[in-house]
Amino acid sequence: MEKSKIETYLGFCVRARKIAFGADGIETLKKGVFLLVCDQSISPNSFKTIEKAREKFSCPLLMTPPDMLGALLHKPAVKAAAVKDKNLALAILSVANGDSQFKLYSGGTN
């Protein structure tokens, strides 16, 4: 199976240590988040935490299909991640805009 570009960019984030995993990990961050990525199968309480982080950091929130984020990161339990590198965040967003399975969250029901 061929790797997608988003999977490659997220892999770069992991290798560069420019990513935080999970709602609790994102909640502890103070600054420097440029993109939030969230799985649609995340629990409602964790999603509220991610929404608060989106407002706090004024960054876009990218929604993936259920259980896809864990597969992209090769960490099945991960349902949320924060990208802390501006250029990688822009690259992920540019690829996601051309792909119909990724959605930018803009508030309300998704």
Feature annotation, model-predicted:
Residues 57-70:
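Conserved phosphate-binding/catalytic loops in two-lobed NTP-binding clefts
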Residues 26-28, 68-73:
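Short, flexible, solvent-exposed loop/turn segments with mixed acidic/basic and small polar residues
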Residues 1-8, 104:
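Conserved catalytic alpha/beta core of Sir2/sirtuin-type deacylases, generalized to analogous enzyme cores
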Residues 24, 41, 65-68, 86:
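Short, ordered loop/turn segments at secondary-structure junctions
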Residues 70-110:
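C-terminal structural segments of small proteins and small subunits
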Residues 30-60:
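N-terminal positively charged helical leader segments and presequences
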Residues 18, 34-35, 60-62, 79-81:
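Structural motif
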Residues 5-38:
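N-terminal first-folded block
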